[in-house]
Structure formats: C-alpha cells, structure tokens
C-alpha cells in the first residue's frame, strides 16, 4: 500500500487540543472497507473521514473505530478545511462532496466554512416498548428519521429529569435518540 496523507483536525476550534477531533485521509483510489476500518481503528478518534480527491465531486466516507457511519458533520467540516487549505485552488469557495446519502456542500466565506447537509424529515411513528424502556417513560410523540429517533416529551422539565437507560438506547435500530419538548417560552 502506498502512503496515505492523514491529518488530524480539531473541528469547531482554533485552539490546539480542543474542539472535536477527526482524522482525514486523503486518497486517490478507494481502499477496501476492511483497510479503511483498520485505519479508523488505529486512529482511535470518534471519526476518520476518507476523501477520494480523484473523483468529482469529491467522494467522502466516514468510519468510527467500530463501523462505517452514514454522515458525520465535524469530520466533513475538517475535511473541507484540509481540502481548502491543501488540495484545491485557493480562490475556490465551494466544495461538493458526494456521500452515500447524497451531496453535501462546504462553502468558504473568509476564514469560516459553512456546511449544507441533506435534509432529514422524521416521520411520526407509534410508540414502541424499546423506546419507552430506553426513556423509562412514554413520549408524547415519536418520530423516526434517517439515522435517529426523536422523542417529544410532555414538558421541558421532563427532558431535564429524564433518566436514560443507555444500554437500551444502544440496542435501538438507530444511531441515537434525540429528546425534546416544547419550552416554557415557546
């Protein structure tokens, strides 16, 4: 295997050792899924992004140390920073990424980078016992998006006081569980 440039970027911060770290691997041809998974495991960061710069738009994939992810915001932001700084024309102000889920745009304005992600419109679903077990209460409304469940509780106070069962959350058929409620001032 040829050498692969790997960058570690702390997204959302200008200070060293702060922010949200991600590894960025810039490649010109795809590696096997097993190799990318092994690299992510060795990097041991929450996400490692693989950006294939030989494809237009640039194709991007994200791996945790355990598995491939469908989408990762901070690793996309970090990837855009590396590409703007090191790989594309300095006058460019936009990068289009192609991901398994669709296209993502990174727009550079001055020193800032803005991301435009595909929309996710969660659909209402019936309550189910797994969610109730994870929340230890019955949500007022429940929705399922592409990656996550969204549980709407009765009150803001319920959100503050919920005692989650993280073991049950890890058993859900989703990346995560988002909890919300109408606030007092809404």
Model segments located where?
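Active-site proximal loop and beta-alpha junction motif in alpha/beta enzyme cores
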Residues: 1-71, 77-186
